[in-house]
Amino acid sequence: MFQDNPLLAQLKQQLHSQTPRAEGVVKATEKGFGFLEVDAQKSYFIPPPQMKKVMHGDRIVAVIHTEKERESAEPEELIEPFLTRFVGKVQGKNDRLSIVPDHPLLKDAIPCRAARGVQHEFKEGDWAVAEMRRHPLKGDRSFYADLTQYITFADDHFVPWWVTLARHNLEKEAPNGVATEMLDEGLERQDLTALNFVTIDSASTEDMDDALYAEELADGRLQLTVAIADPTAWIAEGSKLDNAAKIRAFTNYLPGFNIPMLPRELSDDLCSLRANEVRPALACRMIISADGTIDDDIAFFAATIESKAKLAYDNVSDWLENNGTWQPDNEGIAQQIRLLHRICLSRSEWRHHHALVFKDRPDYRFVLGEKGEVLDIVAEPRRIANRIVEESMIAANLCAARVLRDKLGFGIYNVHTGFDPANADALAALLKTHGLHVDAEEVLTLEGFCKLRRELDAQPSGFLDSRIRRFQSFAEISTEPGPHFGLGLEAYATWTSPIRKYGDMINHRLLKAVIKGEAIARPQEDITQQMAERRRLNRMAERDVGDWLYARFLNDKAGTNTRFAAEIIDVSRGGMRVRLVDNGAIAFIPAPFLHAVRDELVCSQENGTVQIKGETVYKVTDVIDVTIAEVRMETRSIIARPAA
């Protein structure tokens, strides 16, 4: 009799609308219970039985119950699941398979089966890609997943690489395809094969995309010609190879190997500016005054060049510093190195005064064995030869930015607008507490930003610099010319790495249109989004593989007294993150390792400090000695403690 009773339905509706609810994100703990985080201030307890319906990271709506003044959340509706596509390790065999997601806070095995069309017979320990098919909040009895791709077996030495690439859905190998002959682009190429062009790279580099040639003019000024590899001479816009490069957007550099944007035949051979091989190039000629200013008379042109020497950073640096035994092959090459060194010094000086120069940080290189084992991690400081190439490339990219802006009004630009205007007042207030006075309006201009950066660089430590980093906006890729505050330049458009960056290939095509005096369409906006997304994924992949290799490398140091110098890079409520100076590994120091009495300890992310009994004991940028307490291989995390 109550079946279709409208009064009962109304009562139910009323009760439903009067019951308090909250939307938020589920945070799991290792103890079975969890929390519904509504915002930074408010969270609700989720009891263990209710946690069985949800997963860490799910965005849900929950009913809020109050019992004996204690609030708890009962998950009711799924807004957005945390897991859709994921990688994990298979458990069980035959018909009873499950998969444990490869995530530090997801420990439970999810029942699964191989999806239709997947041929592999999965067994214990296999790595796989899975997709969620069922969720308790969608009316299903339990969680369930399909295995959509086999990655590799448990003991594969190269698990870090294959699993990471599968996780981010990135390619594992070079694209297929060959370029049979050069295109007829209607370009006249200047024959520069007689000139002493040189390339300077790491000794192991195969994809050389820049060659340099310098000469001194009669009036004492220096003329620099930057010749860049010319893949668009082989790859037509809209072709199969072009579309593959557009999707990849960048060569993906991972520890130990790279996955190129172009077929290796092009990237490492046909386009690579190899010594004593004639190659097509796109070139830029500029004149540099004694104070480092680049003349307005910038020339872009198509050329044919022949590099006369493949030089290595360390050899060139040693020779300029009068160290080591290496010598240039002949006086012509020696003269090139000397002239390029002069250009580097004057451009560096100009950028110090008129733009901004980054602080030098070492690059960390993993030395790997045949089986992917980490033999060593080497810190490679940026030396004078690295700076020669860097200054030449920045100058060339500045020239391209100007020419594209003035001739076309568009291009692929790297744009960075400094501080977010919404943060300007908070930034000025923070700086004031440290004795630096800035105008909140002025600091949003390129000039004001540069002025502040120079003041910060003059500080005795990088502490204040680290405090204001959170107020900065992110660099973007844009088709519209705009300033690059980080470099302190009015505009910046890269074209010097077309073998490894699709945006540089686009700029090549635009520059060629300028050279020929032809009209050309503005690049589509969606390409900048694809490039930004790929850059993000490639960086995450590099970090993930690095974390895995660092954990392998430091595993045997866990629990020993081996000391490492470490720079504090972040403070949070739970402790501090540090970077080991010698190898670049990131480790976490939990708060209890800093001081045993929790009430006497204040870890402030806001201030970047750790206080014990009111005294600041640690702050961001401090370098301290640590030992490795534990390496958790399953989550690739390194736990350190201050050395006694």
Swiss-Prot record:
GO CC terms: cytosol
Pfam family, one: RNB
InterPro entries attached to this UniProt entry: CSD (IPR011129), NA-bd_OB-fold (IPR012340), RNase_B_OB_dom (IPR013223), RNase_II (IPR011804), RNase_II/R (IPR001900), RNase_II/R_CS (IPR022966), RNase_II/RNase_R (IPR004476), RNR_Ribonuclease (IPR050180)
Superkingdom of source: Bacteria
GO BP terms in the entry: mRNA catabolic process
Localization per Swiss-Prot or TrEMBL: Cytoplasm
Recorded catalytic activity of this chain's protein: Exonucleolytic cleavage in the 3'- to 5'-direction to yield nucleoside 5'-phosphates
SMART domains according to UniProt: CSP, RNB
Top enzyme class: hydrolase
E.C. numbers: 3.1.13.1
Domain called S1 motif: residue spans: 561-643
Residue ranges occupied by any RNB domain in the UniProt entry: 189-516
One annotated GO molecular function: exoribonuclease II activity
Keywords linked to the UniProt accession: Cytoplasm, Exonuclease, Hydrolase, Nuclease, RNA-binding
Chief site of localization: cytoplasm
Family statement: Belongs to the RNR ribonuclease family. RNase II subfamily.
Function noted in UniProt: Involved in mRNA degradation. Hydrolyzes single-stranded polyribonucleotides processively in the 3' to 5' direction.
Name of the protein described by the UniProt record: Exoribonuclease 2
Species this chain originates from: Salmonella heidelberg (strain SL476)
